[in-house]
Regions:
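Non-catalytic interaction surface on structured domains
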Residues: 8-12, 30-40, 57
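ATP-dependent carboxylate-amine ligase catalytic core
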Residues: 16, 22, 26-37, 63-150
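Conserved beta-strand/loop subsegment of P-loop NTPase cores
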Residues: 153-156
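Charged, amphipathic alpha-helical linker segments immediately N-terminal to NTP-binding catalytic cores
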Residues: 1-16
Length: 156
C-alpha cells in the first residue's frame, strides 16, 4: 500500500460545502473510541510562531528526558513531518498503515484532509498515551479539528 495513493484518496473526501463545526471530527473519533480523551496535550494556537514554540518545547522535553508526540501542519517536505510519536517522525510504512485504518473506519464519509489527519494523529498517539502531546492548531482554534481535547493541560 503506497502512502501517496492513500493521501490522494483522503483528499477526495473533502466536503462540497463549508461547515466550520467539529461534527465530522467528533463522529470519526467516536468510531475510534475517542482516543483524544486519554491524551495529555499542550495546544499551541495563534497566528505566528506556533511551530517555533513547539520546537522550543520539544527541546525542553528532550533535555528533561520526557517523551513526547508532536502534531504540526503544514509539512515542508513530507507529510510524515506532521506525525512525531515517541520522539521520532513516523516512517512511510507506519503512516500508510495508520491512515489506511482511519480511512476504513471513516467509510467514505465527507471530512477535510486536515480533519482526518488530525484524527489519525490522535489515534496513533494512543499507543504512546503516557507521552506529552504538543499539538499545533490549524486556522481557527475554536472550530479547529485539534480543539476537541478533554485533557488539554494548557493552551499557549
Amino acid at each position: 500500500m503506497k502512502l501517496q495513493t492513500i493521501l490522494k484518496r483522503l483528499q477526495k473526501l473533502h466536503p462540497k460545502e463549508i461547515d466550520l463545526s467539529l461534527g465530522r471530527v467528533f463522529r470519526l473519533c467516536k468510531k475510534l473510541g475517542n482516543p483524544q480523551n486519554n491524551l495529555d496535550c499542550i495546544s499551541v494556537v495563534g497566528t505566528n510562531g506556533k511551530y517555533s514554540t513547539i520546537q522550543v518545547m520539544k527541546s525542553i522535553l528532550d533535555e528533561s528526558n520526557i517523551n513526547y508526540n508532536i502534531y504540526t501542519s503544514p509539512h515542508l517536505k513530507k507529510i510524515n513531518e506532521r506525525f512525531v510519536y515517541n520522539n521520532k517522525e513516523i516512517n512511510d510504512e507506519d503512516l500508510a498503515k495508520l491512515l489506511n485504518k482511519i480511512e476504513k473506519i471513516n467509510n467514505g464519509d465527507e471530512i477535510t484532509f486536515f480533519e482526518i489527519l488530525t484524527v489519525a494523529f490522535f489515534y496513533g498517539a494512543k499507543n504512546f498515551n503516557k507521552n506529552i502531546n504538543l499539538i499545533e492548531a490549524g486556522l481557527f482554534h475554536r472550530f479547529d479539528a485539534t480543539n476537541i481535547l478533554e485533557k488539554n493541560l494548557v493552551t499557549i
